[in-house]
Amino acid sequence: MKTMKLVVALAFCSQMAYAEFDHKEVIEGPFTQGSDVTEQCIECHEDHAKEFMKSSHWTWELEQELPGRTVKRGKKNSINNFCVSISGNEPRCTSCHAGYGWKDNSFDFTDMTKVDCLVCHDTTGTYIKEPAGAGEAMAKVNLERVAQNVGQPVRDNCGTCHFYGGGGDAVKHGDLDSSMSYPEKDTDVHMDTDGNDFQCQTCHTTASHQISGNAMGVSPGGENPIGCENCHDSAPHDNKKLNTHTAAVACQTCHIPFFARNEPTKMRWDWSTAGQELTETKDKNGKKTFMNKKGSFEWQKMVPPQYAWFNGKADAYMAGDKIDPAQVIKLTYPLGDINDSKAKIYPFKVHTGKQIFDSKLNILITPKVFGKNGYWDKFDWDLASKLGMEANTTMKDKGLSYSGEHGFVETEMWWRINHMVSPKEQALQCSDCHNKGQRLGWQALGYDGDPMKNKKGKRHPTD
């Protein structure tokens, strides 16, 4: 039977290269797990699987340049101020990996059958991964039906992970959440379901399973940028005065006046209050502001961005880097200033936090919070720190382990704001920034006050 199926599949392979077709002709279950589906997929799509296995969506790391050093960095080894790190927490974190079975450091990245084709190509809307199952599909999913109805990705495929990063809707990004599945024009003019109806890959163009674009949080040194200029020229306005702004002001700055337009986004996470006997409360939007196992949170909706100069490059804290606990630790942040001719003013979400660090070694700790003996199990920070550091291969390679002493330090993490582009009628107006406008902090940006008023003050090289 398998031989016959393979013959039929091969007969369709050339057709599949040019157009979608009915996979019911070549896919036959039943399937007990996702990797069983993949085994059938690669009978025709082995080359595609090999392409995908070269992507950062599979490896969760990318070689990149940070100031003064070349690093391999990605979700695999970065530290954030949400759930902190995947080390020791893999079964929970890797529910967003496009693969099956990444339970710990022994995961085999060369095993093609572990690639999850369905999470990106499901068209039924029924494919769901176990929240803490190391990427495996939920038992209730009809894998045969999903596999027989695959197609090009749509927003919901990407959103399965990117809308829910950090453990919930709108937690991390601020400009990506469930409202982007079928957005109205006021939410995003590009993805507007009744208008342009862009899919993610309309802008994040893809070739050989390599998807353009890099997130600052995990790949601050990534050199695969996309931007408004990919479609729009440098003089997009009829008003010449507005066009003079484009050399120093990014399109997003004026055209994304607010993020988290529909769903509140997390703006602060304080781990230091975890374990305290406090009442679990909710804010006006129904979001929890304290959880015993996670600490305290702050959420905001319709958030004006924070603005900073950005020249397309960024820097980041790497596991094992020394810190000064008296300072706010910047986990990722944009580079550039008013003197940099390549920099423009961009909008950002800045997520602040208070997270655990080794107070003897002065390094950030990657605690084990999930699973047996994790913090959520034992509520023991010393044990969670010891186990998390032991599970972190980067720390082990640097000869670092938990010293037995810990504290909590203030951190911040910068996130680029690129989505939720408003209709042009809702873009910022001159008076939002100039004259009495308070939108931009001129002095924080390096100006001597409003440059419209102080024409002899400090200027950007392009002004």
Predicted ranges, named:
Residues 9-19:
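Hydrophobic h-region of N-terminal signal peptides that target proteins for export
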Residues 2-9:
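Sec-dependent signal peptide recognition
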Residues 294-334, 338-346, 351-355, 367-391, ...:
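Long, compositionally biased charged/polar accessory segments in the mid-to-C-terminal portions
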Residues 422-424, 431-434, 438:
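Terminal low-complexity/disordered tails
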Residues 18-154, 160-225, 229, 233-243, ...:
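Sequence context of c-type cytochrome heme-c attachment sites
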Residues 224-332:
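Repeat-solenoid scaffold signature
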Residues 429-432, 446:
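Extended, compositionally biased alpha-helical segments that mediate assembly or anchoring
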